[in-house]
Swiss-Prot record:
Family annotation (CDD domains): ASKHA_NBD_HSP70_DnaK-like
Function: Acts as a chaperone.
Gene Ontology terms for molecular function: ATP binding; ATP-dependent protein folding chaperone; unfolded protein binding
Keyword Transmembrane: no
Protein name as catalogued: Chaperone protein DnaK
Name of the encoding gene: dnaK
Region (Disordered): 595-635
């Protein structure tokens, strides 16, 4: 049976882990790093797709084809305010497609967020496979606790496109609690997980109990903001740098994508440095140029200035904390321990603010960048049977219901209900002789239907003619362990039933997902062929170099005819390298190897002769010249 891996699909960075001999193992990627930038790039002059650090390295010179923070678009519609805000902040193109979803366009091709996220998941899959030495087909993938149904479904689609059977979607704060609590917590504790990542913020209140040797993790409540994270902090620094540069130099950098990409990298670096230093310098030579010549950016930023720039963002995290406590029917003093998760929590001001709110110093026992992946691996271990005595009870973050007469949302399942769960309610017709009812499924907390998230709708038809209010239609909601919803409607009189797994009114169809899976498989073939081509080119380069070197060393021992034949074979191989025909390169490698065989034999003969000479010399050195003394016989 193949191993189930745990993947933290982050906005800024991603991470993969497995259970290994009863312990969690974070797996290093091919670059030797424990986390991978969630960045995908499409180079201008190549069909290759770059993922992770290689994509990040070329971002400055290729900003419009370098995609980052794609998680913020997953499961979202183009017209949402959050998406409209991002359009003006990122260098790549966000577009609206026919179903209303927000996609991106790169090099003339439109792509869905799950399709792009699948590239990052694919990198995590390959990282695990390289470590394990076997194919991986199953995974547990984490999502922000406050992700709605559309975003959860889109994340599952991304896993599927990457070639994985997603065994479970698990909330990030819950995963972090697992990582923290499985080994470190004894007895019963109520903990708060404050998770401020690259693009999202979550807070969860979780009760941990030891019951007859089994650890129970029960989520009491969760809240958050799916468009608040480190990326927003970076943007505040970028905005400050742009304003200061414009004031000082009179040049607006917002219209220069390459300059903005350099500013983004500098902002992220400055933010990290200010977590351990009181001040940092942002130096960007030749950031732009005008008629007067090149312009250099040199601006000092203090920690106090950064705190001022992001003060409102920090305050935005407190309200969800208050709501989560209220929903759990607890006060801050009831919390035993606070865990910080997400790279942005390394900011000292965040730690202080959380400490002030909960009245206790946050624990630093877990790595904020790795805790979520570790928890995903533990959950994978539970599902695979490797981890015993752990029970996880998660919740649905938002209320679920249907639209009823007058545009009102009637809730069937309240937020923070433990999942899996189901609920049913009887509804009726609104007018006489109504032959069909439309079930419009909603998610959210508002009473007005229009103010909530529309998850989809379907019709139950064939209802017999009857006065309004007489037919009985039973609507049933069923949420699985991933927080994904099935809805059915049944006419109690006729027994007719209609049911669907909720897909957002947008979202990817099954056909689109299958097409993307096939595209991903095709790209996997392309990637393999590309790697094989590069290997052949490298072999050719190495052979050319060594042959030229040998020719030079043996120039006095090689005839002009031999030299001419070998040099011609070298020239032909050099020409072949300039094209991307692997077969032609391999053929020319064989030709040069064959033509250069006499050279190889000469080198071997020369080496053998030298060794023989050395051995003879050593043997001569080993002969001892003895001193003889003549002894005269006196007899």
């Amino acid at each position: 049976m193949s191993r189930i891996i745990g993947i933290d699909l982050g906005t800024t960075n991603s991470c993969v882990a497995i259970m290994d001999g009863g312990n969690v193992k974070i797996i290093e990627n091919s670059e030797g790093d424990r986390t991978t930038p969630s960045i995908i790039a499409y180079p201008k002059d190549s069909e290759e797709v770059l993922v992770g650090q290689p994509a990040k390295r070329q971002a400055v010179t290729n900003p419009e084809n370098t995609l980052y923070a794609i998680k913020r678009l997953i499961g979202r519609r183009f017209d949402e305010d959050a998406v409209q805000k991002d359009i003006n902040l990122v260098p790549y193109k966000i577009v609206k497609v026919d179903n209303g979803d927000a996609w991106v366009e790169v090099k003339g091709k439109k792509m869905a967020a799950p399709e792009i996220s699948a590239k990052v998941i694919g990198k995590m899959k390959k990282t695990a496979e390289d470590y394990l030495g076997e194919e991986v087909t199953e995974a547990v993938i984490t999502v922000p606790a406050y992700f709605n149904d559309s975003q959860r479904q889109a994340t599952k689609d991304a896993g599927k496109i990457a070639g994985l059977n997603v065994k479970r979607i698990i909330n990030e704060p819950t995963a972090a609690a697992l990582a923290y609590g499985v080994d470190k917590v004894k007895g019963n504790k109520t903990i708060a997980v404050y998770d401020l990542g690259g693009g999202t913020f979550d807070v969860s209140i979780i009760e941990m109990e030891d019951i007859d040797g089994e650890k129970h993790f029960e989520v009491l409540s969760t809240n958050g903001d799916t468009f608040l994270g480190g990326e927003d902090f970076d943007q505040r620094i970028i905005g400050y740098l742009v304003d200061e540069f414009k004031r000082d130099q009179g040049v607006d950098l917002t219209n220069d994508p390459m300059a903005l990409q350099r500013l983004k990298e500098a902002a992220e670096k400055a933010k990290i440095e200010l977590s351990s230093s009181e001040q940092t310098d942002v130096n960007l030579p030749y950031v732009t140029a005008d008629a007067s010549g090149p312009k250099h950016l040199n601006i000092k930023i203090t920690r106090a200035k950064l705190e001022l720039l992001v003060e409102d963002l920090l305050k935005r995290t407190i309200e969800p904390c208050k709501t989560a406590l209220k929903d759990a029917d607890l006060s801050a003093s009831d919390i035993d321990e606070v865990i910080l998760v997400g790279g942005q929590t390394r900011m000292p001001k965040v730690t202080k603010m959380v400490q002030d709110f909960f009245g206790k110093e946050p624990k630093k026992d877990v790595n904020p960048d790795e805790a979520v992946a570790m928890g995903a691996a533990i959950q994978a271990g539970v599902l695979g049977g490797d981890v015993k005595d752990v029970l996880l009870l998660d919740v649905t973050p938002l209320s679920l219901g249907i639209e009823t007469m007058g545009g009102i949302m009637t809730k069937l399942i309240e937020k923070n209900t433990t999942i899996p769960t189901n609920a049913s309610q009887i509804f009726s017709t609104a007018v006489d002789n109504q032959s069909a009812v439309t079930v419009h499924v909603l998610q959210g907390e508002r009473n007005m239907s229009s103010a909530n998230k529309s998850l989809g709708q379907f019709n139950l038809e064939g209802i017999p003619n009857a006065p309004k209010g007489q037919p009985q239609v039973e609507v049933t909601f069923d949420i699985d362990s991933d927080g994904i919803l099935d809805v059915s409607a049944k006419d109690k009189n006729t027994g007719k039933e209609q049911s669907i797994t909720i897909k957002a009114s947008s979202g990817l169809s099954d056909e689109e997902v299958e097409k993307m899976i096939k595209d991903a498989e095709a790209h996997a073939d392309e990637d393999k062929k590309f790697q094989e081509l590069v290997a052949s080119k490298n072999m050719a380069d190495s052979l050319i170099h060594s042959t030229k070197k040998t020719l030079e060393e043996l120039k006095n021992e090689v005839s002009d005819d031999e030299k001419s034949v070998i040099e011609m074979a070298i020239t032909e191989l050099e020409k072949a390298i300039k094209n991307d025909d692997k077969k032609a390169i391999d053929a020319k490698i064989q030709t040069l190897s064959k033509k250069a065989q006499p050279l190889t034999e000469k080198v071997q003969a020369k080496s053998s002769a030298e060794n023989t000479s050395k051995e003879k010399s050593k043997a001569d050195d080993d002969v001892v010249d003895a001193d003889f003394e003549e002894v005269k016989d006196d007899k």
